[in-house]
């Protein structure tokens, strides 16, 4: 459980960072309150032994959208097997790329499940979105930020569920598969863009032009001594214009 809580905190920190909120003065409303049982995420309800399937994940996001005017659930494409690629938008008056750019919003993209068996990011993101919907995270953080969350990127691979997808990983009991239904690794496809999922993602990226991008992964049982590790680009990915 600790690593999921830390992940949600990392993303909350990223939101605070781009809004200029300092760690010395964190938002406090409702932060110490226990989460009501009806708002526990599917993974929390199982004591993190299970991760929700695609339909359950989308249904939980839609519940959050019904509970909070800040949250909207949409999609940015269709997978080869006909599943929508989900996108959750958290904003105040910047729910489209045009609105976000016109209002000079900072855009933060959090992407989960590019390797669908690596589900910690997805489950942590659902906790984060729940805390936003229930007021545990200060809404004023979104006066100047739009948060985009992709709960599951590799949706078809996610539904190739089984107990042996990542046999060295410490839970959950079952999880999705690394590659897509076309056996493509989306994390190796950004340039060649063979997958329809990648092409949809590139359209999303070009439309929103995020200022900050978080891409979550999970180790396959490696003992790294840390609950969460952060890595960032140190070099440009393309020549300067």
Language model region names:
Residues 8-20:
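Bacterial N-terminal signal peptides
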Residues 2, 7, 23-241:
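Structured catalytic-domain cores with a bias toward divalent-metal coordination
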């Amino acid at each position: 459980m600790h690593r999921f809580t830390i992940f949600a905190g990392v993303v909350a920190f990223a939101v605070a960072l781009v809004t200029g909120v300092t760690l010395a003065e964190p938002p406090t409303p409702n932060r110490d309150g226990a989460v009501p049982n009806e708002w526990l995420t599917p993974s929390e309800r199982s004591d993190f032994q299970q991760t929700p399937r695609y339909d359950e994940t989308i249904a939980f996001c839609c519940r959050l959208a019904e509970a909070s005017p800040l949250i909207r659930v949409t999609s940015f494409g269709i997978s080869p097997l006909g599943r929508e690629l989900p996108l959750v938008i958290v904003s105040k008056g910047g729910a489209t790329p045009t609105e976000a750019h016109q209002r000079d919003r900072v855009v933060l993209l959090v992407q989960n499940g590019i390797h669908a068996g690596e589900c910690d990011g997805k489950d942590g993101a659902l906790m984060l979105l729940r805390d936003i919907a229930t007021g545990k995270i200060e809404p004023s953080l979104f006066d100047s930020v739009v948060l985009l969350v992709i709960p599951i990127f590799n949706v078809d691979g996610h539904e190739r569920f089984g107990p042996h997808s990542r046999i060295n990983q410490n839970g959950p009991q079952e999880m999705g598969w690394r590659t897509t239904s076309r056996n493509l690794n989306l994390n190796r496809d950004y340039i060649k863009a063979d997958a329809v999922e990648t092409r949809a993602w590139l359209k999303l990226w070009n439309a929103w032009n995020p200022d900050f991008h978080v891409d979550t992964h999970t180790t396959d049982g490696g003992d790294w001594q840390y609950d969460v590790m952060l890595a960032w680009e140190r070099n440009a990915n393309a020549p300067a214009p």
